């Protein structure tokens, strides 16, 4: 297929990239894992894995089960998504470019020989070695910068500060188990409010509470 770009990953930042590429006239195929764990699910095309299709603004991504179906979706002007964690479709379809938008903070297997142009978003890659170009994803003055030599700013592990709040904005699970959501994305919540429960392998229930007042921007899928 002409003007084909393959994007590895369909999370929120990947989705913004995909949206722009499709609007620019490219055919875009997204490769995802079988059970994506996007947090800002409402704006992540990876949700098509679970829902068969997912709309973000005026664009709808459709899950494809084979190459023929994917090509039909893309010819209609929509991004297609296939479950292909190892990138096997890259070898078969020979895209003009591969974009690693997994945002794993490390390279999970993307190489420069995958396509004439290879691009990676965020840290974990060296431009000129792992890929041709790295795009800075750290919020601030360098956000979106095109890096042709070197790497993006290393992951700090600390969320960006908004209105004086940083690490408080992200809540980590207090236990291993299955997530049972109580609140929903876009809910206004208060500090201490119950957001979800964790069902542990031992059969106990662990509460997950809000760490601050505010709007719930993201939440991993119920049952994950």
Question: Can you name each region flagged by the protein language model?
Answer:
Residues 1-224:
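Well-ordered secondary-structure scaffolds
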